[in-house]
Amino acid sequence: MGLFGIASQQAFADNNDYTKYVDPFVGNADNGHTFPGACRPFGMIQTSPVTGGVGWRYCAEYVYSDSLIWGFTQDHLNGTGCMDLGDILVMPSTGKRTRSWDGYRSHFPKTQEFATPGYYSVYLTDAKVKAELTATPHVAFHRYTYDSADSTSVLIDLQHGPAWNDKQYHSQAVSYTHLRAHET
């Protein structure tokens, strides 16, 4: 019993930071089906950028070679090779609001994209916004730092999700208070 107590103390005495050896961008290349975003072990949230959402290539909604971010979704499947989740796309924006399907997307330089376990950040050049993401086991936290306070907004897209083809989605703004949509 005493030997077990000594051995268990040594196992928990290791204060090394092993996260510095983790590169969340590994596996993000074409058809890797992994994402670089923030998540926690056994957590329900995997918040990450979306660079595409149509076709098998985008099962995790992120491909490293892309240069356009559609927004940030709150849950992903990592490395599965199948499409699901990718719910609640959120995107900070500036300028005139639009109903255009792709009007809120933004380019980003790879030199200003950073990820470590539990944290992701990127600078969106079109929107002129720094986006930072982190996660708890049940909640995603987003922080947006705008270069200018003029015409800032946050788009929340409840319809977004990965799809085999773009015909799987349909939505129609019937009025300012009524949205009709379906996903197959």
Name what the model sees in each region:
Residues 1-14:
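Bacterial Sec-dependent N-terminal signal peptides
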Residues 13-180:
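Accessory carbohydrate-recognition regions in carbohydrate-active enzymes
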